[in-house]
Structure formats: structure tokens, C-alpha cells
């Protein structure tokens, strides 16, 4: 079991219960899932780029990514409905906790010119979204084998009812918010 999950059960739950005055353990917000998304617009011209992006995402997450397809045709972007244009992974359970631990302790500190993550990137319902400009911050990616530096979106979905609850939950995990 991931250390962060044990830490959540042992310490974070008690801390949040006293902070927000919850009566039941089930009221305490928890991390539900983490979604990783990589949009590969250049895949229209070269299908191999999408395969490389999917391989990178699989290495980062430890799970086979789902290839996302265009929902509708857009002439300006030269895409048709059904074209593969990206890939995504939804992590839950044990894999989610392991990824969350690696994200906080290893990957985020390796971001160039890192001064903390914005605390304003919540969606109003306690879910946090962030963008990573380079996939090479993850130790699973071999720098020498990277064909192109790509970014990815990371969304942390919580059961929090408000942004304040979500912020308190992530702050309890020592999430590196900008001061």
C-alpha cells in the first residue's frame, strides 16, 4: 500500500475533521481519481507521434492509455471526426496513490524554475488541474529516448464540496502551492 494513502488515513482525515468540523469520516474529502491527458495535435500528419506519446504516458502512469478521438470535424485544424488526436489515462486506487506520491515528491520539484503551483487552479468544486510543459520531469522517461518534449494535463478529482476543502486536502499532503 502506498505511504501517502496510509498518511491520508492516519493523519489527514483527523486534521480535516477538526479543521472543518465534520461529524463522520465519510464527510472528509478524499482524492477520487487522477486523470492524465496528452493532446497530440501533430498526430494528424504523423501517426507515429501519437504512439510515442502513448508510450510516454504508459511509462509515467503504469497503465495503457486510451486513445482519444476528435468529437467533430474542424476544417481550420484539418481534423475530421474520429481522428485520433490524443491519449489519456484515469488512475484510481493503488496506482493513483503511487502516482500522486511520485508527483509530489519527485516530479514537481524537477520542474525548471519551479516556484510553487498556483493555488487558484481549482474548478469551484474542489478539483485541481495543472499543466506540465515537459514529460521529462518524470523519472520513468529516459531523456535520451525522447523524440519530442511534450506537455500533459493532470487533473486531481476530489470529493470536496468547495475549493477551500480541496485546497486544505491537497495542502495536508504538502502539495507545493505558491505562497
From Swiss-Prot:
KW Transmembrane helix (keyword) present: no
Pfam families given in the database record: Ribosomal_L5, Ribosomal_L5_C
GO biological process: translation
Keywords: Ribonucleoprotein, Ribosomal protein, RNA-binding, rRNA-binding, tRNA-binding
Cited PROSITE patterns: RIBOSOMAL_L5 (PS00358)
Molecular function GO terms recorded: rRNA binding; structural constituent of ribosome; tRNA binding
Biological function: This is one of the proteins that bind and probably mediate the attachment of the 5S RNA into the large ribosomal subunit, where it forms part of the central protuberance. In the 70S ribosome it contacts protein S13 of the 30S subunit (bridge B1b), connecting the 2 subunits; this bridge is implicated in subunit movement. Contacts the P site tRNA; the 5S rRNA and some of its associated proteins might help stabilize positioning of ribosome-bound tRNAs.
Family, per entry: Belongs to the universal ribosomal protein uL5 family.
PANTHER family named among the record's database cross-references: 60S RIBOSOMAL PROTEIN L11-RELATED
Descriptive protein name: Large ribosomal subunit protein uL5
Name of the gene encoding the protein in the UniProt record: rplE
